[in-house]
Amino acid sequence: MMQSKLASLTLKGFFTFGLFLGALFSSLAASAQQASPSLPLLFDARERLARPDLSSLVRLRFLTSVDFPPFNFTDQNGKLSGFNVDLAREICSELEISDKCQIQALPFADLRDALAASQGDAVIAGFAVTPELRRQFVFSRPYLMLPARFVRNLAVPLDGKTAAALSSHPVGVVRGTVHEAMLAAFFPTLKAEPFDTKDALLAALKDRKVDAAFADALQLSFWVSSPASAKCCALFDGPYLSEHFLGEGITIMLRQKDSVLTSAIDHALATLSRNGRLQEIYLRYFPYGLY
């Protein structure tokens, strides 16, 4: 997936932005009545990463885009918002450089060249880590993994609470995707029913043409809590993580020469994970959880 965001995972094209906001706000309201979902720890709580000296830093400009909700987008008031935007601000606060921090939005296609040309210092926009990008840039440690999940039609009785309960049921998946390959590798005995698009897959699930589906947890989480699902379905089993199929996770991209800044960002991410601030931001945008 050269020079792309985690394209198969973005909500763009999955449903409209208005529907995304509706799902988000309804999720926020409902989450107050639910136990808080946990964010898996990606940093060892015992690990203490050194905090580099940033006293000579003149500016830290984060670059992002506005087409990757709920990670980075403009809200209904035109304000730059999202998980990544809030995280960038928390990183600056943790490093005690908030007065030196800026966040600028550019078209996604321009981010790579802008970083290379020193028009910004770090890209926080959901770039997929690829060997090509690693030859030119460095990446922070991942701060969020996007898993795969099953979703089931609640009208279909299942004998169990794990994927084994789906053994006699058709499971939909989008043809030609990493999730189709992952389903075949992880669950070779399940009966996969391929569909050409996500819309076709979810329509079939809603209409009980398939009993379950296997796809990206981010998309499924917002769909099941949105009016589009008509409360037909729920997440089931999982999560399932695989670096081979799903990549290294969401990271921050920097220039190779900026090793001190990279170490500082890793220090901030580890601290935010340890003190619970990363979890707070996660719950703000994923109140139903991905895991």
What are these language model-derived features?
Residues K12-S26:
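Bacterial N-terminal signal peptides
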Residues L28-A32:
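Sec/Tat signal peptide C-region and signal peptidase I cleavage site
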Residues Q33-Y291:
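Proline/Glycine/Serine-rich low-complexity intrinsically disordered segments
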Residues M1-L11:
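N-terminal secretory signal peptides that target proteins for export/translocation
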